[in-house]
Regions:
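Membrane-interface segments of envelope glycosyltransferases acting on lipid-linked substrates or membrane lipids
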Residues: 137, 169, 182-183
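Bacterial N-terminal signal peptides
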Residues: 18-30
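Charge-biased low-complexity segments
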Residues: 35-57, 61, 65, 74-83, ...
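N-terminal secretory signal peptides that target proteins for export/translocation
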Residues: 1-15
Length: 437
């Protein structure tokens, strides 16, 4: 049986791009002091410093409350202007983390829209979706599912049972069901999203293939690697039957198959064979796909690094780096792929002591390390942990047993210094206290 979603997450840091993987940098700001010219004929008086008041979330809520009141006075309770004002108030209350009041305001907006345009007006879809998002942020996942479901009901009634716009709502329902540890029900939403695309498009269309890959990725993110491979193989069969054995569309499922084995930490032969088949297929194409070739070579390099090929010198990494130099966004891709902490073999983090209960509180561990040219971590050090010592050993073991993509600097495989990863988790303080006793 597949495991439930992990209660831990990890973040990696980049001083330039918050979502990229990079090393910690110490950022210092310098201030220049202006001096008056000693020979100046006129005395220059410094302008008084005026402090600009900083608006707080509470200030924004009060302003929106006043706006709602004035809008009702000016336009009446059941008006589009009033409904929009309620949505603005709800957004402000949500930003201030007053989720109970935010729910009331979103529901007031829904009530007004329905009074104006009927119970199935499409105007309620957006506030109902935002209401679900607010419930999720408040960790009220049951009500989140209900709100998203109501928004989807309206969408199906207005735009048709098979309209693709409801897929974003299915995704939200799926995520909330995962939060409730209802994996089977969550997967059912993803299957329904795939079926919606299949009903609206030809079986061999790019839209259907993309939907299959999307579902495959969802399965892989939950650790269901064989089921993920099954979807890639399904796409492979569709492409071969519709476009032939040499169509470049085959590259995507081949890479998907190969990388599932690596992410599963399974060095089975079919994994590297799929990657090599993708490379051969691209080389046979009449027009060179530099990005595709760079990606395949990167993934072959990741396989060799992950499974410790003896004497591997990173040839595929170097060739991939060179190919990226021919692309308009090559510099950005080089930075994304060949700098920072990029896993090639992910050692699972022990879930002992972590909790998905609603009353669980947040904890984290921040760890720093280097990687050598073979992708091995070294000098692994805990920089910060909360609560101290609770998950330190688990995170240290995770980093030491994982493997990372080495850097490529000016075309040469190089070590990566001073990388950092933050692992976030939730735990029950009482459980820790009982364990220590």
């Amino acid at each position: 049986m597949p495991s439930m979603r992990s209660a831990t997450t990890h973040r990696r840091y980049d001083c330039r791009l918050p979502i990229a993987l990079a090393w910690l940098l110490s950022c210092a700001a310098s201030t220049a002091l202006a001096q008056a010219d000693a020979g100046a004929a006129e005395e220059i008086t410094a302008a008084p410093v005026v402090e600009t008041p900083v608006e707080t979330p509470a200030d924004n809520v009060e302003a929106n409350e006043r706006f709602v009141a004035s809008t009702i006075t000016g336009y009446g309770r059941n008006s589009l202007q009033t409904a929009e004002a309620y949505v603005g108030l709800a957004d402000a209350q949500r930003k201030a983390a007053d989720y109970e009041k935010a729910a009331e305001s979103y529901l007031s907006a829904v009530e007004v829209y329905r009074a104006i345009d009927g119970p199935f007006t499409p105007l309620v879809i957006a506030p109902l979706t935002s209401l679900g998002d607010s419930y999720r942020e408040a960790e009220d996942h049951t009500n989140a599912v209900a709100s998203y479901g109501e928004a989807r009901t309206v969408s199906r009634r207005v735009y048709g049972l098979h309209n693709p716009d409801q897929i974003v709502l299915l995704d939200r329902i799926s995520e909330s069901l995962l939060d409730l540890d209802q994996l089977v029900e969550a997967e059912a939403q993803q299957v329904e999203a795939l079926r919606l695309i299949q009903r609206a498009n030809a079986p061999e269309s790019d839209a259907v293939l993309s939907a299959i890959y999307r579902y495959a990725g969802w399965l892989g993110d939950r650790g269901m690697f064989q089921l993920e491979r099954d979807q890639y193989m399904r796409a492979q069969r569709i492409i071969r039957q519709s476009y032939g054995d040499s169509d470049p569309r085959l590259v995507t499922p081949l890479l998907g198959i190969g990388n599932t084995y690596r992410r599963e930490r399974n060095p089975a032969g079919p994994g590297i064979s799929a990657l090599e088949d993708a490379l051969e297929l691209l080389r046979e194409q009449p027009q060179r796909d530099a990005l595709g070739l760079a990606m395949v070579m990167r993934d072959i390099g990741d396989w060799n690094t992950a499974f410790g090929k003896m004497g591997y010198a990173g040839m595929e990494y170097q060739r991939s780096w060179e190919l990226l130099g021919t692309l308009p966004n090559g510099a950005e891709l080089r930075d994304d792929w060949y700098a920072g902490a990029n896993y090639v073999l992910y050692e699972p983090i022990s879930q002992r002591g972590v909790s998905t209960e609603r009353e669980a509180v947040a904890g984290h561990v921040l760890v720093q390390f280097d990687i050598d040219v073979a992708g091995n971590p070294g000098a692994v050090t805990i920089l910060e942990s909360d609560p101290p010592g609770f998950k330190d050993e688990a995170v240290l073991r995770h980093v030491r047993r994982s493997r990372f993509r080495p850097w490529v600097v000016e075309g040469v495989v190089a070590p990566g210094p001073g990388l950092a990863i933050r692992v976030d988790f939730r735990y029950l303080p009482d459980a820790i206290a009982a364990e220590s006793d």
